Curated annotation (Swiss-Prot):
Disulfide-bond pairs as recorded: none
Region feature (Disordered): 1-20
Amino acid composition bias (Polar residues), ranges on this chain: 1-11
Keyword Translocase: no
ATP-cone domain ranges (all copies): 49-139
Entry protein name: Transcriptional repressor NrdR
């Protein structure tokens, strides 16, 4: 592993431990050339995913880009970073276990919205507004109507 401070390849792992859900290994490292300490994270990657954008361009799947877009949707919302990380891991697992190495950005968006809907309604609407490219207030009304009908259905099930 290359040192982020001096670019030396002479580094050593000082401590390794799994995260709470055991999906990632956290490693503390030290550079033997400059004594700089840094942390790396290691996770299993089942397959290389390629995203097919709306314009037809193909780009490698970027987990960090997904995290950033969700952080924007969740800005100022009462959601713990751990819950966000769990959701992102679940989305990535679903994508990787889907059997396809290429997946459309639309399919990724739908999967993300499915998970986000369970996490936070406001973030769901924010994400939907960008993903579905809302142009008018009625676009928001439609999504809010979906959420309202889901809430009514859940309440009816609880009464039974």
């Amino acid at each position: 592993m290359r040192c982020p401070s001096c670019s030396s390849l002479d580094t050593q792992v000082k401590d390794s431990r799994p995260t709470e859900d055991s999906s990632v290994i956290r490693r503390r490292r030290v550079c033997l050339a400059c004594n700089f300490r840094f942390t790396t994270f290691e996770r299993v990657q089942l397959r290389e995913l390629t995203v097919i954008k709306r314009n037809g361009r193909r780009v490698p799947f970027d987990r960090d880009k997904l995290v950033r877009s969700l952080q924007i949707s969740l800005r100022k919302r009462p959601v713990d970073p751990e819950r966000l990380e769990e959701m992102v891991s679940a989305v990535v697992r679903e994508l990787e276990s889907g059997g396809e190495s290429e997946i459309s950005s639309e399919a990724i968006g739908e999967i993300v919205m499915e998970h986000l809907r369970k996490l936070d309604d406001v973030a769901y609407v924010r994400f939907a507004s960008v993903y579905r490219n809302f142009r008018e207030a009625k676009d928001f009304e439609a999504v809010l109507g979906e959420l309202s009908s889901d809430e009514l259905a859940r309440a009816a099930l609880l009464r039974k």
